[in-house]
Amino acid sequence: MIGNYVYYLHYDKEQATTLYKVGIDGKGRAKVSDNYLFTCSTLGQYFYSNGTTTDGCLYQYDSVSDEMTKIYDCNCYKPIVSGTDNVYYLDVNQNNALVHTNISADKPRTLTTDSIDLYNVYGSYIYYQRYSEDHPALCMIKNDGSDFKELAQGNYSNINVTSNRIYFTDFKTRQVFYTSTSNPGELTPFHPGVAK
Protein backbone atom coordinates (compact mmCIF):
# COMPACT_ATOMS: atom_id res chain seq x y z
CA MET A 1 0.00 0.00 0.00
CA ILE A 2 1.26 3.43 -0.96
CA GLY A 3 -0.88 6.46 -0.21
CA ASN A 4 -4.48 5.57 -0.96
CA TYR A 5 -3.67 2.68 -3.31
CA VAL A 6 -3.11 -1.03 -2.83
CA TYR A 7 -0.67 -2.53 -5.34
CA TYR A 8 -1.09 -6.21 -6.15
CA LEU A 9 -0.19 -8.95 -8.62
CA HIS A 10 -3.00 -9.97 -10.97
CA TYR A 11 -3.06 -13.20 -12.96
CA ASP A 12 -5.13 -14.17 -15.97
CA LYS A 13 -4.61 -16.67 -18.79
CA GLU A 14 -4.10 -14.02 -21.48
CA GLN A 15 -1.46 -11.80 -19.84
CA ALA A 16 -0.10 -14.04 -17.07
CA THR A 17 1.05 -12.03 -14.02
CA THR A 18 0.83 -8.23 -14.15
CA LEU A 19 0.96 -5.44 -11.57
CA TYR A 20 -2.25 -3.55 -10.74
CA LYS A 21 -3.37 -0.92 -8.27
CA VAL A 22 -6.75 -0.10 -6.78
CA GLY A 23 -7.88 2.68 -4.47
CA ILE A 24 -8.63 1.82 -0.85
CA ASP A 25 -12.24 2.74 -1.65
CA GLY A 26 -12.29 -0.05 -4.27
CA LYS A 27 -12.26 2.42 -7.18
CA GLY A 28 -9.63 3.39 -9.73
CA ARG A 29 -8.41 -0.13 -10.58
CA ALA A 30 -5.64 0.15 -13.19
CA LYS A 31 -2.78 -1.87 -14.64
CA VAL A 32 0.57 -0.44 -13.56
CA SER A 33 2.96 -2.76 -15.39
CA ASP A 34 2.86 -5.66 -17.84
CA ASN A 35 5.93 -7.05 -16.10
CA TYR A 36 5.87 -9.42 -13.19
CA LEU A 37 7.43 -7.92 -10.04
CA PHE A 38 8.35 -10.59 -7.52
CA THR A 39 9.34 -8.53 -4.51
CA CYS A 40 9.50 -4.89 -3.67
CA SER A 41 10.32 -2.45 -0.90
CA THR A 42 8.45 0.81 -0.28
CA LEU A 43 9.69 4.18 0.89
CA GLY A 44 7.48 7.25 0.72
CA GLN A 45 5.76 7.52 -2.65
CA TYR A 46 8.11 4.96 -4.23
CA PHE A 47 8.48 1.24 -4.40
CA TYR A 48 11.64 -0.53 -5.46
CA SER A 49 12.11 -3.87 -7.18
CA ASN A 50 14.61 -5.77 -9.26
CA GLY A 51 14.14 -6.07 -13.01
CA THR A 52 12.50 -9.26 -14.22
CA THR A 53 12.50 -8.98 -18.01
CA THR A 54 15.77 -7.67 -19.48
CA ASP A 55 18.05 -7.27 -16.45
CA GLY A 56 18.23 -7.58 -12.68
CA CYS A 57 18.90 -3.91 -12.01
CA LEU A 58 17.22 -1.90 -9.25
CA TYR A 59 14.10 -0.03 -10.38
CA GLN A 60 12.08 2.69 -8.69
CA TYR A 61 8.36 3.12 -9.33
CA ASP A 62 6.94 6.58 -8.61
CA SER A 63 3.32 6.22 -7.49
CA VAL A 64 2.61 9.89 -8.27
CA SER A 65 3.83 9.90 -11.88
CA ASP A 66 3.21 6.14 -12.48
CA GLU A 67 6.71 5.85 -13.95
CA MET A 68 9.25 3.05 -13.50
CA THR A 69 12.91 4.11 -13.70
CA LYS A 70 16.15 2.13 -13.49
CA ILE A 71 18.14 3.74 -10.66
CA TYR A 72 21.04 1.35 -10.02
CA ASP A 73 22.97 -0.98 -12.30
CA CYS A 74 23.46 -4.34 -10.58
CA ASN A 75 22.11 -7.89 -10.74
CA CYS A 76 20.00 -7.82 -7.61
CA TYR A 77 17.20 -9.83 -6.04
CA LYS A 78 14.87 -8.91 -3.17
CA PRO A 79 16.08 -5.32 -2.66
CA ILE A 80 15.26 -3.43 0.54
CA VAL A 81 15.60 0.34 0.41
CA SER A 82 15.92 1.76 3.92
CA GLY A 83 16.75 5.37 3.07
CA THR A 84 16.91 7.68 0.09
CA ASP A 85 20.18 6.14 -1.16
CA ASN A 86 20.58 3.22 1.28
CA VAL A 87 20.00 -0.18 -0.38
CA TYR A 88 20.43 -3.83 0.62
CA TYR A 89 20.07 -6.59 -1.96
CA LEU A 90 20.99 -10.17 -2.75
CA ASP A 91 23.68 -10.16 -5.44
CA VAL A 92 22.79 -12.78 -8.03
CA ASN A 93 26.35 -12.71 -9.42
CA GLN A 94 27.68 -13.68 -5.96
CA ASN A 95 25.29 -16.62 -5.35
CA ASN A 96 22.79 -14.39 -3.50
CA ALA A 97 25.33 -12.88 -1.09
CA LEU A 98 23.99 -9.89 0.86
CA VAL A 99 25.26 -6.53 -0.39
CA HIS A 100 24.80 -2.99 0.91
CA THR A 101 25.33 0.12 -1.16
CA ASN A 102 24.71 3.81 -1.12
CA ILE A 103 23.36 4.50 -4.61
CA SER A 104 24.81 8.00 -4.85
CA ALA A 105 28.30 6.83 -3.81
CA ASP A 106 28.10 3.56 -5.84
CA LYS A 107 30.35 1.59 -3.50
CA PRO A 108 28.71 -1.82 -3.03
CA ARG A 109 29.97 -3.80 -0.05
CA THR A 110 29.37 -7.51 0.48
CA LEU A 111 28.17 -7.97 4.07
CA THR A 112 28.17 -11.76 4.07
CA THR A 113 29.12 -14.30 1.42
CA ASP A 114 26.49 -16.74 2.73
CA SER A 115 23.96 -17.67 0.07
CA ILE A 116 20.71 -16.17 1.36
CA ASP A 117 17.12 -17.25 0.75
CA LEU A 118 15.40 -14.32 2.47
CA TYR A 119 16.17 -11.51 4.88
CA ASN A 120 14.79 -8.55 6.77
CA VAL A 121 16.44 -5.33 7.93
CA TYR A 122 15.48 -3.72 11.23
CA GLY A 123 17.44 -0.90 12.82
CA SER A 124 21.12 -1.78 12.81
CA TYR A 125 20.59 -5.54 12.32
CA ILE A 126 19.86 -7.86 9.42
CA TYR A 127 18.14 -11.19 10.02
CA TYR A 128 18.45 -13.80 7.27
CA GLN A 129 17.96 -17.43 6.27
CA ARG A 130 21.25 -18.96 5.15
CA TYR A 131 20.89 -21.39 2.28
CA SER A 132 22.97 -24.53 2.67
CA GLU A 133 22.28 -28.16 1.86
CA ASP A 134 24.31 -29.20 4.92
CA HIS A 135 23.95 -26.32 7.41
CA PRO A 136 20.92 -24.08 6.75
CA ALA A 137 20.26 -21.62 9.56
CA LEU A 138 18.52 -18.46 10.67
CA CYS A 139 21.29 -15.91 11.24
CA MET A 140 21.85 -12.27 12.07
CA ILE A 141 24.55 -9.66 11.48
CA LYS A 142 24.90 -5.94 12.07
CA ASN A 143 24.19 -3.79 9.03
CA ASP A 144 27.94 -3.33 8.52
CA GLY A 145 28.49 -7.11 8.28
CA SER A 146 29.95 -7.56 11.77
CA ASP A 147 28.74 -9.56 14.81
CA PHE A 148 27.52 -12.70 13.01
CA LYS A 149 25.28 -14.92 15.14
CA GLU A 150 23.47 -18.13 14.26
CA LEU A 151 20.04 -18.02 15.91
CA ALA A 152 18.65 -21.42 14.91
CA GLN A 153 19.68 -24.32 12.70
CA GLY A 154 17.25 -25.41 9.98
CA ASN A 155 15.09 -23.74 7.36
CA TYR A 156 12.88 -20.81 8.32
CA SER A 157 10.66 -18.39 6.43
CA ASN A 158 8.54 -15.29 7.08
CA ILE A 159 11.13 -13.30 9.03
CA ASN A 160 9.22 -10.40 10.59
CA VAL A 161 10.64 -7.97 13.12
CA THR A 162 8.91 -5.73 15.66
CA SER A 163 10.51 -3.40 18.19
CA ASN A 164 11.03 -6.24 20.69
CA ARG A 165 10.63 -9.57 18.84
CA ILE A 166 11.79 -11.43 15.75
CA TYR A 167 9.14 -13.82 14.38
CA PHE A 168 9.85 -16.61 11.90
CA THR A 169 8.25 -19.86 10.72
CA ASP A 170 9.79 -23.34 10.73
CA PHE A 171 9.62 -24.39 7.08
CA LYS A 172 8.80 -28.07 7.80
CA THR A 173 6.41 -27.87 10.76
CA ARG A 174 4.90 -24.42 9.98
CA GLN A 175 5.31 -23.57 13.69
CA VAL A 176 5.91 -19.87 14.31
CA PHE A 177 8.68 -18.99 16.77
CA TYR A 178 9.97 -15.75 18.21
CA THR A 179 13.04 -14.48 19.99
CA SER A 180 13.93 -11.16 21.58
CA THR A 181 15.50 -8.38 19.53
CA SER A 182 17.48 -7.16 22.57
CA ASN A 183 19.02 -10.58 23.33
CA PRO A 184 18.23 -12.98 20.47
CA GLY A 185 18.88 -16.66 20.97
CA GLU A 186 16.28 -18.61 22.92
CA LEU A 187 13.42 -19.65 20.62
CA THR A 188 9.88 -19.61 21.97
CA PRO A 189 6.90 -21.12 20.12
CA PHE A 190 4.34 -18.43 19.29
CA HIS A 191 0.72 -19.23 20.08
CA PRO A 192 -1.48 -16.22 19.35
CA GLY A 193 -4.31 -15.62 21.76
CA VAL A 194 -7.92 -15.28 20.76
CA ALA A 195 -9.30 -11.74 20.70
CA LYS A 196 -12.32 -11.33 22.94
Predicted region positions:
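Repeated scaffold domains used in trafficking and secretory/extracellular systems
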Residues: M1-G3, D34-G44, D73-T84, T113-G123, ...
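Short loop/turn segments that connect beta-strands within beta-propeller blades
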Residues: G23-K27, Y61-D66, T101-D106, K142-S146, ...
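Generic beta-strand structural signal
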Residues: M1, Y11, I24, S41-T42, ...
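A short beta-strand motif characteristic of beta-propeller blades
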Residues: K27-S33, D66-Y72, D106-T112, S146-A152, ...
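Residue position within the beta-strands of beta-propeller blades
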Residues: Y7-L9, F47-N50, Y88-L90, Y127-Q129, ...
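Solenoidal tandem-repeat scaffolds enriched in leucines and small polar residues
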Residues: S33, C40-L43, F47-Y59, K70-Y72, ...
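Hydrophilic extracytoplasmic domains
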Residues: E133-A137, K142-K196
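Structural motif
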Residues: E14-K21, T53-Q60, Q94-H100, E133-C139, ...
